Structure formats: structure tokens, C-alpha cells
């Protein structure tokens, strides 16, 4: 089953089935990637080296605005997805829905079941990454 490199959040179930059929280890990265720069490219290359399939969970325009502030995003989610999908190291871009809750991010991570959750030291790590990490209560 062939699937576009750009996947909508609402097609997550079908996407997970495709990943299972492909086999191999999945590396999951999350972020805004609003103004793609060399730091992003190096990070994505390094993340891709950790497994067989690199999936970028791309934040919505609404979430990017909340994380980055007024005037952001510069590029819409569709444009950011197209740019990311053109990079050879990126296998899939999963366009996240707006207003996801911590539990949505956790469920997404459980369903995709990555071998590696690649985290940047940058502040852009986003709610996706912080929600995916265990909380100490």
C-alpha cells in the first residue's frame, strides 16, 4: 500500500497500518519547523540515522502560534509539510491537528510505537515532546 509522504492526523489509523507493513524501526520527531534552518536539517539527519523510517509530527498553525508567539507561523502547516517532505531523510510528515491535548500526543506515540523519540535541545521541542516524556508526580 503506497501512501503519500504527507499524512493527515485524521488518517493516523491507516498510517499506522502502513508503518507496520513496512516493518523496520521508526524514529519519531515532533516540532514546528516554521523557518527551516541548518540546525533542523542536521537534527533530522541525525534522527534518521537512529532507525529505518523517520516520521516528523508537524505542529498545526494554531499550536505553532501558541508556542512561537504572535506573527507565527511564517509558513502554513501545508507549506512546512511540503518543505519537510522534500528532504530525503524524511520518510513521512504527519500533520498534527490543532489543539491536541497531552493525552492525544501520548496516544499518537503509543500508536506509532517508535523505536526512538528524537528530541532536540532547542526550545522548539514543542508540546509534542514534553507530553511524550514521563511526568514525575
Where do the model's predicted regions map?
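Nucleotidyltransferase catalytic core that binds NTPs
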Residues: 1-137
Amino acid at each position: 500500500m503506497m501512501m503519500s509522504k504527507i499524512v493527515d492526523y485524521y488518517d493516523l489509523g491507516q498510517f499506522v497500518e502502513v508503518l507496520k507493513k513496512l516493518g523496520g524501526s521508526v524514529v519519531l520527531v515532533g516540532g514546528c519547523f516554521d523557518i527551516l534552518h541548518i540546525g533542523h536539517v542536521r537534527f533530522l539527519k541525525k534522527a534518521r540515522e537512529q532507525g529505518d523510517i523517520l516520521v516528523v509530527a508537524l505542529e498545526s498553525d494554531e499550536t505553532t502560534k501558541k508556542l512561537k508567539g504572535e506573527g507565527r507561523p511564517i509558513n502554513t502547516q501545508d507549506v512546512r509539510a511540503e518543505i519537510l517532505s522534500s528532504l530525503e531523510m524524511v520518510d513521512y510528515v504527519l500533520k498534527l491537528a490543532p489543539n491536541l491535548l497531552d493525552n492525544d500526543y501520548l496516544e499518537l506515540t503509543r500508536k506509532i510505537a517508535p523505536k526512538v523519540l528524537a528530541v532536540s535541545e532547542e526550545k522548539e521541542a514543542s508540546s509534542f515532546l514534553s507530553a511524550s516524556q514521563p511526568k514525575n508526580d
